[in-house]
């Protein structure tokens, strides 16, 4: 967490290797994946959602086409989008459904770390809760770690075990979620 401009998104980009940084990033996982705030801008409007979810496997994996299709369909079902959605395009989906496609696309390559940059802030509260519940279920099922970037302290409290507070590009506080909320050093 941190105010706008504190370096939260820059930290995420550094972990993903999208920006230069000084220092060292250590993680013992397959390539981290990202889920963005606005799923519509990160989904190709010309592709079906099945094709969108298949793309990372086409790029990163060496799988036969039938396995790519099967895995994409399984992942879409896992995030709550059954076969009736697979041939739809992003413009035919609600915001929550598009965010489910983004989550499926991130998880299809089986990362250990998923970075969620304000991933539920554009959704109404009811849909936010559904997506957060889905993320917690997937976290347990796939043994995932999440890096949540959010201004919404309720999201942080509900979903995180540990919290870092950033200010002017620096980590100024790091502790358990309970310690940060009960005894903040940087309120």
Briefly describe each language-model feature range.
Residues 89-93, 97:
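Conserved ABC ATPase signature
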Residues 67-84:
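Conserved ABC ATPase "signature" region
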Residues 174-175, 183:
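ABC ATPase "signature
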Residues 156-158:
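A short, surface-exposed alpha-helical micro-motif characterized by mixed small hydrophobic
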Residues 103, 114-115, 131:
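Hydrophobic anchor residue at the start of the ABC signature
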Residues 108-112:
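A short, proline-enriched helix->beta-strand linker immediately N-terminal to the Walker B motif
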């Amino acid at each position: 967490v941190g105010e706008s401009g504190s370096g939260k998104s820059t930290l995420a980009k550094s972990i993903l290797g999208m920006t230069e940084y000084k220092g060292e990033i250590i993680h013992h996982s397959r390539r981290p994946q990202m889920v963005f705030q606005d799923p519509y801008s990160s989904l190709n409007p010309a592709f079906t959602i099945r094709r969108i979810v298949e793309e990372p496997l086409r790029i990163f994996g060496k799988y036969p086409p039938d396995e790519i299709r099967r895995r994409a369909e399984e992942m879409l079902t896992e995030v709550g989008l059954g076969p009736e959605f697979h041939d739809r395009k992003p413009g035919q989906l609600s915001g929550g459904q598009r965010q489910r496609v983004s989550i499926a696309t991130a998880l299809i390559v089986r990362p250990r770390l998923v970075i969620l940059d304000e991933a539920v802030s554009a959704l109404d509260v009811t849909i936010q809760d559904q997506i957060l519940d889905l993320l917690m279920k997937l976290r347990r099922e796939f043994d995932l770690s999440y890096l949540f970037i959010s201004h919404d302290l309720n999201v942080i409290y509900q979903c995180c075990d540990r919290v870092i507070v950033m200010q002017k590009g620096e980590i100024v506080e790091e502790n358990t979620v309970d310690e940060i909320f009960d005894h903040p050093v940087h309120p």
